[in-house]
């Protein structure tokens, strides 16, 4: 292997039941060589072995979970060692998968599996203890994905979208609409509240529609306060996004929330995605728009 060639290293971790198996399978499909439960202290030696092999292997994914909970300090030491040895050679990212407690409990009940830390078979006790153990690791993560509302195929799509770029230093802006009544997305870097804007929900013929439809978006965008908000947020993001990119972040998740995630937030997420489409790789999603249709 050419010693100057960069090696992408993704460390997959997170809450038990949050989707690490799907993440591994998705990265394997992208050409990553995946290793499950490698002791963190052996990571530098393992990478040396990979580099000295005759085969070209420049994309690695390593799964670290509670089976190796005593090794988390060694994980940080190994990452720091690799960073110090050659900043230009290793592109290391920690991918942390998370989900709300209630969803994790539901998944354990559906699969009839026991949480690795659960006492007396009570998954919620294990989940709470696991969160405490993983707090520092989550704080070091460059990528956090909330899988609460994601089906396996949706998680796969999200991982492929985040890791399939030809240029791994490319910068992606994820614009996400959501409803505050369903909770703030935990993987958002920035959150903006647009509940102060006039609400199409109170217009009878607009209530069943969404911000993806012209009538609703026209209604939301016609107000003076909407245009003032757009102008101010465009100015703020025009300043902030280049700073995030310069800092070395590979992606930023921007959450725009209204009450139900159906009208105002959807309209504005679509608007800002179009505004910045010529400057950045944009991805827009509407977390709660289907929930809104059901109500």
From Swiss-Prot:
This is Nucleotide-binding protein BH3569. ATP binds at residues 14-21. Disulfide bonds: none annotated. GTP binds at residues 65-68. Pfam families: PapZ_C, RapZ-like_N. Keywords: ATP-binding, GTP-binding, Nucleotide-binding. InterPro entries: P-loop_NTPase (IPR027417), RapZ-like (IPR005337), RapZ-like_N (IPR053930), RapZ_C (IPR053931). GO terms for molecular function: ATP binding; GTP binding. Displays ATPase and GTPase activities. Belongs to the RapZ-like family.
């Amino acid at each position: 292997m050419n010693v100057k060639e960069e090696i992408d290293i993704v460390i997959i971790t997170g809450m038990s039941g949050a989707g690490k198996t799907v993440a591994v399978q998705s990265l394997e499909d992208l050409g990553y060589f995946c290793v499950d439960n490698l002791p963190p202290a052996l990571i530098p030696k393992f990478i040396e072995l990979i580099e000295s092999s005759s085969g070209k292997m420049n994309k690695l994914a390593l799964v670290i979970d509670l089976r190796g909970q005593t090794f988390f300090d060694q994980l940080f030491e190994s990452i720091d060692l690799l960073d110090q040895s050659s900043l230009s050679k290793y592109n290391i990212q920690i991918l942390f998968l998370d989900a709300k407690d209630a969803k994790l409990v539901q998944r354990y009940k559906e699969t009839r599996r026991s949480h690795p830390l659960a006492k007396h078979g009570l998954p919620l006790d294990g989940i709470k203890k696991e969160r405490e153990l993983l707090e520092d690791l989550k704080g070091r993560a460059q990528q956090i994905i909330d899988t609460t509302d994601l089906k396996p195929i949706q998680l796969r799509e999200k991982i492929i979208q985040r890791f399939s770029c030809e240029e791994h230093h490319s910068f992606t802006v994820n614009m996400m609409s959501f409803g505050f009544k369903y909770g703030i997305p935990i993987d958002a870097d920035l959150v903006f509240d647009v509940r102060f804007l006039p609400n199409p929900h109170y217009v009878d013929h607009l209530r069943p529609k969404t911000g993806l439809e012209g009538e609703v978006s026209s209604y939301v965008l016609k107000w003076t306060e909407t245009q003032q908000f757009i102008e101010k947020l465009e100015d703020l993001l025009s300043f902030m996004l280049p700073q995030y990119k310069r800092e070395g972040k590979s992606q930023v998740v921007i959450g725009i929330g209204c009450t139900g995630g159906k009208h105002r937030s959807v309209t504005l997420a679509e608007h800002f995605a179009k505004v910045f489409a010529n400057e950045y790789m944009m991805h827009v999603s509407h977390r709660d728009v289907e929930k809104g249709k059901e109500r």
